[in-house]
Design a protein with these regions (language model features):
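A domain-level signal for the structural core that forms small-molecule/cofactor-binding pockets
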Residues: 1-117
Length: 117
């Protein structure tokens, strides 16, 4: 929960700053907790769109863990929205990708409950 996301909008070359929330069900494979942070950081380093970043994090973890049971929610401020054009300083964008067991509405609800606190 609350993994720092610091990326760059590929359209406007302005910062995207937020938090990623990641969860998985292990099928026997585990990774060090900091590896989740490193995966988020790895994909955040390049100019991005948030939707793709969210999917890339899930796919990388699915491959590393050998399970489809991975979820990622990213809540981030896009300085291209906050500082230019509409200049809405209070808005953020939320994207989500759910794989495997997280597609079940009860499992998804439980995960979203954990990250909303």
């Amino acid at each position: 929960k609350n993994i720092t996301v610091y990326s760059t909008c590929e359209h406007h070359l302005l910062p995207i700053i937020g938090k990623a929330h990641v969860a998985y069900f292990s099928k026997g494979n585990v990774i060090g907790l900091s590896k989740m942070n490193r995966i988020v950081d790895y994909f955040s380093k390049r100019p991005q769109v948030q939707e793709r970043l969210t999917i890339q994090v899930v796919k990388a973890l699915q491959e590393a863990l050998g399970t489809e049971d991975v979820a990622c929610v990213i809540d981030a401020k896009h300085l291209c929205v906050n500082s230019r054009g509409i200049k809405d300083v209070d808005c953020s964008t939320v994207t989500a990708e759910f794989g495997g067991k997280f597609k079940d509405k009860n499992v998804k609800r439980e995960f979203l409950g954990y990250i909303s606190n």
